A protein has these predicted regions:
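Bacterial N-terminal signal peptides that target proteins for export
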Residues: 1-9
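An edge-strand/N-cap motif at the start of beta-rich repeat modules
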Residues: 21-48, 53, 257-261
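A short beta-strand motif characteristic of beta-propeller blades
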Residues: 24-29, 64-69, 104-109, 144-150, ...
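Beta-rich, blade/repeat-based domains predominating
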Residues: 30-43, 71-83, 95, 111-125, ...
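N-terminal, post-signal-peptide region of Sec/Tat-exported proteins
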Residues: 41-76
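A short loop-to-beta-strand structural motif that recurs across blades of beta-propeller domains
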Residues: 55-58, 94-98, 135-138, 175-177, ...
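Short loop/turn segments that connect beta-strands within beta-propeller blades
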Residues: 59-64, 99-104, 139-144, 179-184, ...
Length: 263
């Protein structure tokens, strides 16, 4: 009887804990086909890469959606610069696309191997996860010169940079790795199942990461390795952005984008 009571108590705890973890999530958009990357322009308009739809979708503050760009094969990572130029990686066709605010598009860099998540570095270069080669490539957007800034990774899919210029890389293999400017690597992923594309810097020592395998958003202090679970029960969580003190999470399971407070 005592054992059954303990099992029942554990069930009740997990049930309510799961409910609480979802209570602060709000669905802000739906109808996507595998939302993989999320970014915002200077006006607060959200852009979502529609992986299976080969398109990029704009979501206005009133929830209205429109197709911003069509015809990019398996769009994955997305970032937007201060001039509202949009940069997107084509996972299947191995290039980086630039789309200007007036809609003109151009392939600005090619020859990658399944480029997935992308991010701006602290000095304005484009960081690209080269999934199939296990590398992080830095692209100078002026000269278009490529530099390999990290290698020896296991299926890297997401990257972000800390204030001290260290990189933190999420890898579908289960690894989460910090690479210091001197090349030293620290493994951070002991408590992660399968880190996904979404990863963002939230302070000098902390990042938030999609744990795709666990259906969670997790925060980790890169110095202490302390992990805090921010959200759970997310079906096929892949994308993550941090904008105006809110996280935005893209889920493949139901083709939606959710938001939650990041304070």
């Amino acid at each position: 009887m005592k054992k059954r009571f303990l099992h029942f108590s554990l069930f009740i705890f997990l049930f309510f804990y799961s409910g609480l973890s979802m209570a602060n999530l709000t669905k802000v958009a739906s109808g996507f086909s595998a939302p993989t990357g999320i970014a915002f322009d200077s006006s607060g308009v959200m852009y979502v890469t529609n992986w299976s739809g080969d398109s990029i979708v704009k979501v206005k503050s009133n929830g209205e959606q429109e197709t911003f760009y069509k015809g990019i094969s398996s769009p994955s990572g997305i970032v937007i610069d201060k001039q509202d130029n949009v940069y997107v990686s084509s996972y299947s066709d191995d290039y980086i696309l630039k789309i200007t605010p007036n809609g003109k598009s151009k392939k600005i860099s090619e020859g990658y191997r399944t480029p997935t998540g992308i991010a701006f570095s602290n000095n304005g270069q484009l960081l690209i996860t080269n999934r199939s080669t296990g590398e992080i490539v830095s692209l100078d957007l002026e000269t278009k010169q490529k530099t390999i800034v990290a290698n020896g990774l296991s299926t890297p899919v997401g990257v972000t940079q800390l204030a001290d210029n260290s990189l933190v890389v999420s890898q579908y293999s289960g690894r989460l790795t910090m690479i210091e400017p001197n090349g030293n690597k620290t493994e951070l992923g002991d408590q992660f199942d399968r880190p996904g594309v979404g990863i963002v810097t939230i302070s000098s020592n902390a990042v938030a990461v999609i744990d795709n395998g666990a259906g969670m958003v997790r925060q980790i202090d890169v110095k202490t390795k302390k992990v805090t679970n921010l959200a759970s029960s997310l079906s096929g969580a892949v994308a993550l952005a941090n904008y105006n003190n809110h996280y935005y999470i893209g889920t493949w399971g139901d083709g939606s984008v959710y938001t939650m407070d990041s304070n």
